[in-house]
């Protein structure tokens, strides 16, 4: 283990730094390391420039690698959900991991968290470390109740899984076996491609695999395949789609000859195996569920919403897409996404199935968008954006996109600029997606320096509407009072989301009665102060999992007083070897802050420290009180004259022990990393028993008990000559020289305990005990609801660009924080509204669960359109994607209105049930689909050819020919029927 000198630490730093830059290669193994441990290691080796001053400091020594913070279950070594790279963990290649283990070892009983690098993508390949393995449930055909769970990499093959199952269930090598993929209640699929990977096979989280072996008669218990038929004669097998049988029957006989272990037809990447529930054939078209392939509810929700968008579904059901497939578009997917989507829609609307398994479609999406290739939870809206863009490019009627020179408005009328922008758009983008989903908005930017105004008109496929952000957040903190007898108390405080530490102190003050300026806020981790916050630091740096301790102090930390605040760590000494006299130390317990006079004797400092710990340090004298606790008179400790409220008068004899010295406790002064270092002064060393003196003023009448040994010694760490002067004469006087001693996690006083004395006198259970304030059980009241119009108004509100996303002003020739305003110019036949419920920052992830009240019918958008000739703009709701749960997880479902019967249904993966309009508006609503009323007919399908021809005029506000005849008569009627949202 390397605790060694600066050279060794420099070597560690340089070697690990280089290995962190190792490129990912398919099949390589990388290791997860808890980011908190890694940050501590970086401090110890001086990895970053701001860590140099702590380099080699034994008090920031990280100890053995500890990944317990990443584990949900230490027994199974399963990871917590939704861990984020670099925020929660660091990835290191094998060589880097081995080096760290050789230097620091691993916490006992912990296994390394090793993960493989997998390759994703079809055209643009990229590698990623597969942090979350696929958990599969394994069982035998003869006993499906005996389920064994194992985790596999997506790169593992079916053959590897079979071998693992043979081992688990003790199946002899001579026994023939075959594997089945079992899902839903009674649906099986043969896994007869041993070389296929888990990713190729589309196996998902929680999938159950069944291993079957031949019986004593040499027969398969699940049945055999008749040679005269291409249809499996298994009563327990689901019905397989005819397309899959015809595609695979020709390979049947040759497959049997090649491998007798697998007697069912082979299949092409599991593509065409779509099953219906046995015994159900006559379903209503469109009321077809989608099997969850393992965290794919986000995809199922998106598909159900698109499936119930009438003009798009009619387009695919009528095979119009076949004439418009663009196989050569470099921005498209060679038509594969469109064809796969069409096949899925036809199955869903065939009326043959109560549910289908969208594995083929999922595979195609993963090939072209690697971010969706796994089986982790994803964002439904992000998938919708990809699908709409992918379908558009696959079906783009423009075969060769012309170059378009974009022009600024330059003061021209909006109508002219809008018409020009739309015409330019459809010269390059002309598809069914443009016809149905694309609209136009106006963007106005104003330079704050030169007042340059830039106006552009841009197309959109959906509207992302902001929700008013939560202005507050709840934080749980622990308050440590000056009274040493008071246990720490846990509080829940409500603080501004965009606030600072002073806001936290003010909120805590209202509950505790302690003045904010008498508080110091800290983050404690691994027995040390991870951070000591300044009052002006942002609260966003405090994460939910941080242990925040707020210490009451008797002084304002920023004032020049005759007292100083010192961080105190507790250390337990140990000897490296039985024959070595060199000692090390390890941290334990909770650190604390103590206020002491700038000028203080060593004895008095010792007494103050011991009195500060009197709640959990037992009596050190046989004549102490019977309860065994150190005598603390509350009247003295609270109302006394000393710092922290502790009376300055006190006999050192009460704070010492008659324990005899032994070999393990003779060395009371721990050597610093560098014996000549000026940053660490040792106090209370070997000669303390001879010099336990205090000042003349405070020691009158006190006996000097030099024969008694102290419970601990102490050392000042990272306090240089400009901070502290330690006069090692007869008085042993300590003088803090700086007017404002710096208070941070780097400079502290370490109390070194002998193991035997610690075991006898230090009560760790009492030290960790705390109380709960009633605020902990308080649930903040949330706003009842807001209206959809509030979100639209927020979308069109003028805003100032942030410093991280400035606008380049062509006039100033510089990036400026311009003001920006968006306005709606024209709206599409189907308006997709994305409610921006998720917010992200460097330190925080959050979901807004505000109830947004949106109309089911008659959504009038005329209020928000600045185009006077926009035409009809009343909409009816046709679908909603719902998200339940929090960030990074949860569950997606959908409400949708069937185009044939006009009724609402609830789609929850493979389940479909009737729904009422009262159920639709909820806090879970995430993406809304509205269809314009003038495009709705009896079948839900409108003449798309008309929309194609008149798309440009509709987008720019020019009325259709048919509209001109009826606008005067119908507009008034239509507006009367609309429920205005203002």
UniProtKB/Swiss-Prot annotation:
EC supergroup of this enzyme: hydrolase
Record's protein name: Ubiquitin carboxyl-terminal hydrolase 15
Active site residues per record: 297 (nucleophile), 891 (proton acceptor)
Single Gene Ontology MF annotation: cysteine-type deubiquitinase activity
The keyword Oxidoreductase belongs to this UniProt entry's keyword annotation: no
Ranges of Acidic residues composition bias in the record: 655-672, 962-975
Keywords: Cytoplasm, Hydrolase, Nucleus, Protease, Thiol protease, Ubl conjugation pathway
Location of this chain's protein in the cell: Cytoplasm; Nucleus
PANTHER family the UniProt entry points to: UBIQUITIN CARBOXYL-TERMINAL HYDROLASE, UBIQUITIN CARBOXYL-TERMINAL HYDROLASE 15
InterPro entries recorded: DUSP-like_sf, Papain-like_cys_pep_sf, Pept_C19_DUSP, Peptidase_C19_UCH, Ub_carboxyl-term_hydrolase, Ub_USP-typ, Ubiquitin-like_domsf, USP_C
Any one annotated GO CC term: nucleus
């Amino acid at each position: 283990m390397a605790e060694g000198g600066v050279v060794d630490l420099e070597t560690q730093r340089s070697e690990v730094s280089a290995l962190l830059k190792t490129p990912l290669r398919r099949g390589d193994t990388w290791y997860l390391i808890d980011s908190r441990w890694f940050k501590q290691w970086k401090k110890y080796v001086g990895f970053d420039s701001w860590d140099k001053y702590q380099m080699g400091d034994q008090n920031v020594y990280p100890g053995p690698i500890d990944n317990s913070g990443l584990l949900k279950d230490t027994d199974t070594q399963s990871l917590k959900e939704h861990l984020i790279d670099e925020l929660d963990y660091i990835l290191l290649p094998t060589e880097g991991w081995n080096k760290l283990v050789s230097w620091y070892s691993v916490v006992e009983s912990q296994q390394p968290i090793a993960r493989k690098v997998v390759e994703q993508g079809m055209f643009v390949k990229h590698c990623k470390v597969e942090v979350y393995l696929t958990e599969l449930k394994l069982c035998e055909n003869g006993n499906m109740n005996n389920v064994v769970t194992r985790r596999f990499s997506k790169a593992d093959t079916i053959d590897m899984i079979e071998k693992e199952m043979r081992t688990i269930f003790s199946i002899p090598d001579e026994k023939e076996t075959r594997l089945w993929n079992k899902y839903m209640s009674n649906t099986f699929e043969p896994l007869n491609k041993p070389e296929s990977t888990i990713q190729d096979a589309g196996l998902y989280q929680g999938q159950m695999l069944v291993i079957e072996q031949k019986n004593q008669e040499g027969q398969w218990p699940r049945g055999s395949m008749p040679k005269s038929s291409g249809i499996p004669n298994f009563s327990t097998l689901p019905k397989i789609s005819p397309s899959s049988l015809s595609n695979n029957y020709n390979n049947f006989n040759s497959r049997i000859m090649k491998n007798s272990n697998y007697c069912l037809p082979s299949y092409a990447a599991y593509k065409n195996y779509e099953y219906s529930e046995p015994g159900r054939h006559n379903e209503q078209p469109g009321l077809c569920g989608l099997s969850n392939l393992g965290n794919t509810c986000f995809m199922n929700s998106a598909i159900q919403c698109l499936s119930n968008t009438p003009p798009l579904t009619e387009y695919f059901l009528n095979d119009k897409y076949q004439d418009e497939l663009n196989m050569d578009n470099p921005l498209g997917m060679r038509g594969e996404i469109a064809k796969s989507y069409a096949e899925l829609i036809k199955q869903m609307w065939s009326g043959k199935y109560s549910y289908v398994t969208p594995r083929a479609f999922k595979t195609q999406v993963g090939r072209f968008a690697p971010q969706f290739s796994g089986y982790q939870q994803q964002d439904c809206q992000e998938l919708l954006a990809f699908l709409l863009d992918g379908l558009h490019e696959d079906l783009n009627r423009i075969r060769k996109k012309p170059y378009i020179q974009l022009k600024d408005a330059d003061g021209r009328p909006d109508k002219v600029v809008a018409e020009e922008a739309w015409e330019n758009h459809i010269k390059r983008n002309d598809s069914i997606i443009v016809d149905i989903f694309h609209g136009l908005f106006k963007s106005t930017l104003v330079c704050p320096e030169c007042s340059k105004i830039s106006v552009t008109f841009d197309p959109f496929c959906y509207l992302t509407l902001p929700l008013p952000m939560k202005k507050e957040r709840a934080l749980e903190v622990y308050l440590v009072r000056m009274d040493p007898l008071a246990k720490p108390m846990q509080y829940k405080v409500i603080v501004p989301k965009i606030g600072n530490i002073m806001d936290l102190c003010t909120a805590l003050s209202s509950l505790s009665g302690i003045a904010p300026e008498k508080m110091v806020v800290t983050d404690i981790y691994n027995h040390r102060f991870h951070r000591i916050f300044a009052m002006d630091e942002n609260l966003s740096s405090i994460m939910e999992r941080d242990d925040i301790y707020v210490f009451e102090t008797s002084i304002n930390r920023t004032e020049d007083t005759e007292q100083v605040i010192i961080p105190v760590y507790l250390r337990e000494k140990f000897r490296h070897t039985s024959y070595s006299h060199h000692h090390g130390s390890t941290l334990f317990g909770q650190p604390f802050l103590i206020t002491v006079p700038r000028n203080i004797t060593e004895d008095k400092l010792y007494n103050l420290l011991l009195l500060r710990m009197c709640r959990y340090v037992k009596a050190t004298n046989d004549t102490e009180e019977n309860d065994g606790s150190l005598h603390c008179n509350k009247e003295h400790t609270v109302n006394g004259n000393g710092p922290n409220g502790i009376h300055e008068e006190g006999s050192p004899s009460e704070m010492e022990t008659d324990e005899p010295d032994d070999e393990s406790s003779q060395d009371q002064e721990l050597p610093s990393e560098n014996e000549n270092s000026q940053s660490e002064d040792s106090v209370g060393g070997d000669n303390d028993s001879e010099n336990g003196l205090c000042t003349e003023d405070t020691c009158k009448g006190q006996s000097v008990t030099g024969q008694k040994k102290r419970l601990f010694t102490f050392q000042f760490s990272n306090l240089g000559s400009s901070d502290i002067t330690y006069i090692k004469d007869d008085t042993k006087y300590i003088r803090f020289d700086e007017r404002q001693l710096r208070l941070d996690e780097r400079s502290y006083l370490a109390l070194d305990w002998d193991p035997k004395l610690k075991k006898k006198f230090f009560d760790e259970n009492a030290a960790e005990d705390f109380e709960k304030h009633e605020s902990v059980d308080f649930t903040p009241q949330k706003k009842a609801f807001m209206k959809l119009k509030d979100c639209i108004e927020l979308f069109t509100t003028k805003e100032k660009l942030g410093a991280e996303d400035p606008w380049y002003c062509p006039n100033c020739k510089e990036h400026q924080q311009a003001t920006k305003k968006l306005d709606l110019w024209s709206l599409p036949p189907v308006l997709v509204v994305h409610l921006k419920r998720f917010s992200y920052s460097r330190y925080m992830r959050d979901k807004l669960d505000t109830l947004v009240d949106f109309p089911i019918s008659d959504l009038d958008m005329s209020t928000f359109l600045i185009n006077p000739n926009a035409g009809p703009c009343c909409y009816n709701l046709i679908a909603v994607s719902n998200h339940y749960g929090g960030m990074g997880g949860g569950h997606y479902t959908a409400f949708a209105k069937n185009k044939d019967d006009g009724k609402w249904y609830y789609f929850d993966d493979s389940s479909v049930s009737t729904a009422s309009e009262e159920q639709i508006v909820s806090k879970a609503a995430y993406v809304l689909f509205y269809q314009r009323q003038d495009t709705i007919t009896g079948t839900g399908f409108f003449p798309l050819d008309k929309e194609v021809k008149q798309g440009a005029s509709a987008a720019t506000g020019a009325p259709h020919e048919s509209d001109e005849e009826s606008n005067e008569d119908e507009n008034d009627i239509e507006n009367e029927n609309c429920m205005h949202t203002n």
